[in-house]
Amino acid sequence: MSAAAGKTLADYKAPYPKPTSRQRRYVILLDPKGDNAELNDYKVELIPGRVKLLDGANHYFLGGKIEEKTIDGWGYPYYVVTLAEMAGTAMLPLGNAAHKKLRFVPLHTSSLYRYNSKLPIVVYVPKDGVLRYRIWTAKLSGRGKAKSIKAKEM
């Protein structure tokens, strides 16, 4: 069982803002990896987006941004996501992929953030959005790997 599995945001006793009526708050609790490893070998990629009914051929993405803010007097970071409407698509021919299905459409750009198991990663996403994330690790061979995970709304 993960060391972070039983924790909640309240355990950190920090005054994170409540989500507005137009937001969802996601909290990512990370497993300890050791201070040196967390600083040098691990990163977190935040992947906000929306689930939309779309064809299966094209590659869609959203405009928007992730803004880092800080809890006054605490120095703890949190992130606020703004999602725009559909920013673009590859416009591939449809053929057999014309059938529409629900697909995750990510924010056009993504960034890597510090892996720090001592603090939660708190992300506010528009009500119609969802958050996914990846944990990136550096391997001695020089080839990194990532695992995509759905974030938990709290």
Swiss-Prot record:
This is Ecotin-like protein 2. Pfam families: Ecotin. It comes from the Eukaryota. GO terms for molecular function: serine-type endopeptidase inhibitor activity. InterPro entries: Ecotin_C (IPR027438), Ecotin_sf (IPR036198), Prot_inh_ecotin (IPR005658). Belongs to the protease inhibitor I11 (ecotin) family. Gene3D superfamilies: Ecotin (2.60.40.550), Ecotin, trypsin inhibitor (4.10.1230.10). It comes from Leishmania braziliensis.
